[in-house]
Amino acid sequence: TFLHFSEGLVHIVYIDYLKLAASYENNCAVDEITDDKLESMFDKLEEQYGGYCFDEDYEKKVFSTWSVNDFFQSVVSNKFVYFGEYWYDNGGVPKILSDFVKNNEQELFDCILKGKFISVPTSDLKFPPSLISINPKVLMCQTGYLTLCSNLKYFEMLLGIPNGEIYKALNRL
């Protein structure tokens, strides 16, 4: 199961860690962190580890729990800000991912380098068959390498790369 944090939850649960990261990023004390500096750090966090959408209406985006936790753990232990590829580094390159990249190279290339989206029938997302016959694009969405980029009201869904962490990971393949 893919767990996630909402924007509000990150602001509430991780506020002290956000302030600490912002203080390292700005070379100042935690009590000198302004709202602007705090929001700037949050925006960077969101760009790297947020952007996942599993909402039929394409309204709510969430963060990768694994990556957010590892990011803040790194900030505390290393005393500097480093936006690593925590989720990807934990899982390695599963065969299913390397097969997907090999079989969808041009479409994925267009998504990575040209900012285009990957199209998939809505019915494939709403009613995925067994793991053996699932549309590989849907599986990549379910495993977090792609995310919803449009609502489910049409016959085709658009999928895209959720964030900087996954963008960098896909570029490494």
Model-derived regions, located:
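Phosphate-binding site recognition
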Residues: 1-173
